[in-house]
Amino acid sequence: MLAQVLRRQALQHVRLARAAAPSLTRWYASYPPHTIVKMPALSPTMTSGNIGAWQKKPGDAITPGEVLVEIETDKAQMDFEFQEEGVLAKILKETGEKDVAVGSPIAVLVEEGTDINAFQNFTLEDAGGDAAAPAAPAKEELAKAETAPTPASTSAPEPEETTSTGKLEPALDREPNVSFAAKKLAHELDVPLKALKGTGPGGKITEEDVKKAASAPAAAAAAPGAAYQDIPISNMRKTIATRLKESVSENPHFFVTSELSVSKLLKLRQALNSSAEGRYKLSVNDFLIKAIAVACKRVPAVNSSWRDGVIRQFDTVDVSVAVATPTGLITPIVKGVEAKGLETISATVKELAKKARDGKLKPEDYQGGTISISNMGMNPAVERFTAIINPPQAAILAVGTTKKVAVPVENEDGTTGVEWDDQIVVTASFDHKVVDGAVGAEWMRELKKVVENPLELLL
């Protein structure tokens, strides 16, 4: 009885001590006061991350705003800018460690003047162990892309070790369920037990099973397979795969294709770039981004998103621009395109594309967006293609390369001739839950009108 009373008092003391201590700080009798640095949630969809290069080593001082470590999230390679002051005492997760759950300890921070040698033997278990991977966010939360504080994660319970092995064994390493006689016979006949399916009680391999396997004709030698290389899947690639698979299965796509004459647009682009004196260099994509915004203001139903119970129609046009990076595709956003001029759009796209390729995008650079554009026009082999909608958006425009097309014209004297016209083929993908076929066609008509009369983009 006395032991139970003392135990309850001790537990109460521990609870009070934990309640008084900051959430990131743990105090241990055998170590000086210290703070446990945990894996942060750098995007709303992030549940785990890979550890990149540490920018600080044990003993280095850290000031607010300095980069502590590079972290590969489900979106991009990002810098973890630390917001506290102190000295790095111990690294718990080394460069290259993968799938570290949000909330798991990754390092130890102490105040300046603390002897960091006291932490030489400090382990992950001393910091509370790895956190359990948090559950995936609800779809509505993903759609809103709101950044919320990450709740403190609880440590995952250690698996109970068995007395026979001391640890849980992988299924492939377990001894097959086999009788002693069958095991002996298999050894004599050189029959691999792992390849057999037992017919005895509970799936046990019997002598008869071994005899049948030994008497069976040898399988023809398999032809040597083609050489291959297994490439590890990054968190970003996993996220791309998951989101696009969900988009195809949950968003009923329909497609509208049109040929657009860009002869006037190319002449206007050349004239503007010639007079810019190096201040800017407009691309065809810059004009198309602006044209998307104009079409969306004229047909606002396309600039919308499917939400639970409502269709949300946006007042501003935020265009997500697909950018290919060494680690995968990402879509940084040009916000408020309807209010921006071509020069500003061009500068913004160039800045975002550079940050994307350098892995320097912030969450606010790619979270959100109301409509997307994917342009493969720089590849002369791509005449046209269709793109998958970037959820929760309702539309994406796929742009092919520019080609010269012979078009018939009627001369003033009544004769007919041929002129060469620069054209591109564009295909818009629409979410039929949000956009009806007639609405998608109307949007494409407005886009065609403004692209083929590009002076309207300057209004």
Curated annotation (Swiss-Prot):
Enumerate the subcellular locations listed in this protein's record, separating them with semicolons.
Answer: Mitochondrion
* Recorded superkingdom: Eukaryota
SUPFAM superfamilies assigned to the protein according to its UniProt record, in alphabetical order:
CoA-dependent acyltransferases, Peripheral subunit-binding domain of 2-oxo acid dehydrogenase complex, Single hybrid motif
State how the cofactor is bound.
Binds 1 lipoyl cofactor covalently.
Matching entries from CDD domains are given as: lipoyl_domain
Which InterPro entries does the annotation name? 2-oxoA_DH_lipoyl-BS, 2-oxoacid_DH_actylTfrase, Biotin_lipoyl, CAT-like_dom_sf, E2/Pdx1, E3-bd_dom_sf, LAT1, PSBD
Q: Which residues carry this modification: N6-lipoyllysine?
A: K75
Record-level Gene Ontology MF annotations: dihydrolipoyllysine-residue acetyltransferase activity
Q: Which family does it belong to?
A: Belongs to the 2-oxoacid dehydrogenase family.
Q: Subunit comment for this entry? A: Eukaryotic pyruvate dehydrogenase (PDH) complexes are organized as a core consisting of the oligomeric dihydrolipoamide acetyl-transferase (E2), around which are arranged multiple copies of pyruvate dehydrogenase (E1), dihydrolipoamide dehydrogenase (E3) and protein X (E3BP) bound by non-covalent bonds. The Chaetomium thermophilum PDH complex contains 60 E2 units, 12 E3BP units, about 20 E1 units, and 12 or more E3 units. The units are organized in 1 E2 60-mer, 4 E3BP trimers, about 20 E1 tetramers, and a maximum of 12 E3 dimers.
Q: What does this protein do?
A: The 10-megadalton pyruvate dehydrogenase complex contains multiple copies of three enzymatic components: pyruvate dehydrogenase (E1), dihydrolipoamide acetyltransferase (E2) and lipoamide dehydrogenase (E3) and catalyzes the overall oxidative decarboxylation of pyruvate to form acetyl-CoA and CO(2). Within the complex, pyruvate and thiamine pyrophosphate (TPP or vitamin B1) are bound by pyruvate dehydrogenase E1 subunits alpha and beta and pyruvate is decarboxylated leading to the 2-carbon hydrohyethyl bound to TPP.
User: What information about domains appears in the record's comments?
Assistant: The peripheral subunit binding domain (PBSD), serves as a selective binding site for other domains of the E1 and E3 subunits. The C-terminal catalytic domain catalyzes the transfer of acetyl groups and acetyl-CoA synthesis.
Q: What is this protein called?
A: Dihydrolipoyllysine-residue acetyltransferase component of pyruvate dehydrogenase complex, mitochondrial
